[in-house]
């Protein structure tokens, strides 16, 4: 078991147009528990009345590993000036190991913000890893993101003034092939 926390001081710079608004501290807490095939975790972040709370679990039995993640967000003023509201997010994952091969599948969902209609998105991923050794593997995966008309998860469509801009409602997909080596 381990737990940790942090405080980030003055995470919002003073706005000259709002001289009475102070700078806010950000707070983070996390706890994790590992016991054999079971791994559990929880996390909480808070900043300027915005928060996220999350729970996760992972369980391995034989050649199978299954995992789940749940997160609750509340945004009063960070994403939109008036706040996007609240939402729930989740992810389910699975892995099957056969000799040096790993087969992966997962799906994640970010539900719509309560104050932003049609802002949900769903991501699907299929992957395959082949372990060449304990430290080296080759991998490939395909992922697809389906955005609601007011959601913009995925890749940037352009950049302006050093800001990444994503267009709402665009669906994205990607394919990857690579090698990973841990030194």
Predicted regions: what is each one?
Residues 4-6, 106, 139-141, 178:
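Outer-envelope exported proteins of Gram-negative bacteria
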Residues 74-75, 147-151, 158-163:
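Acidic/polar low-complexity surface segments
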Residues 132-138, 169:
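Short loop/turn motifs that connect adjacent beta-strands in outer-membrane beta-barrel proteins
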Residues 17, 80, 117, 150-158:
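Outer-membrane beta-barrel and related beta-rich outer-membrane complex signature
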Residues 167-183:
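Outer-membrane beta-barrel "beta-signal"
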Residues 1-32:
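Aromatic- and glycine-enriched pocket-lining scaffold segments that form the walls
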Residues 141, 150-156, 166-168:
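Extended amphipathic alpha-helical coiled-coil/heptad-repeat regions
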Residues 24-131, 142-144:
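Detector for outer-membrane/organellar transmembrane beta-barrel domains
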């Amino acid at each position: 078991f381990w737990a940790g926390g942090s405080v980030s001081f003055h995470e919002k710079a003073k706005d000259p147009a709002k001289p009475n608004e102070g700078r806010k501290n950000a707070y983070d807490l996390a706890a994790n528990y590992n016991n054999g095939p079971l791994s559990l975790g929880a996390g909480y972040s808070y900043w300027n009345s915005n928060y996220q709370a999350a729970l996760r679990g992972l369980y391995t039995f034989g050649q199978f590993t299954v995992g789940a993640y749940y997160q609750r967000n509340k945004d009063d003023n960070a994403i939109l000036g008036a706040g996007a509201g609240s939402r729930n997010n989740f992810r389910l994952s699975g892995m099957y190991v056969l000799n040096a091969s790993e087969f992966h599948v997962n799906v994640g969902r970010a539900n719509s913000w309560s104050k932003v209609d049609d802002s949900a998105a769903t991501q699907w991923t299929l992957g395959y890893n082949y372990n060449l050794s304990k430290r080296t593997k080759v991998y490939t995966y395909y992922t697809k993101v389906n955005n609601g008309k007011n959601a913009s998860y995925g890749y940037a469509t352009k950049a302006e003034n050093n800001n990444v801009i994503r267009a709402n409602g665009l669906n994205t997909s990607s394919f990857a092939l690579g090698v990973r080596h841990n030194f």
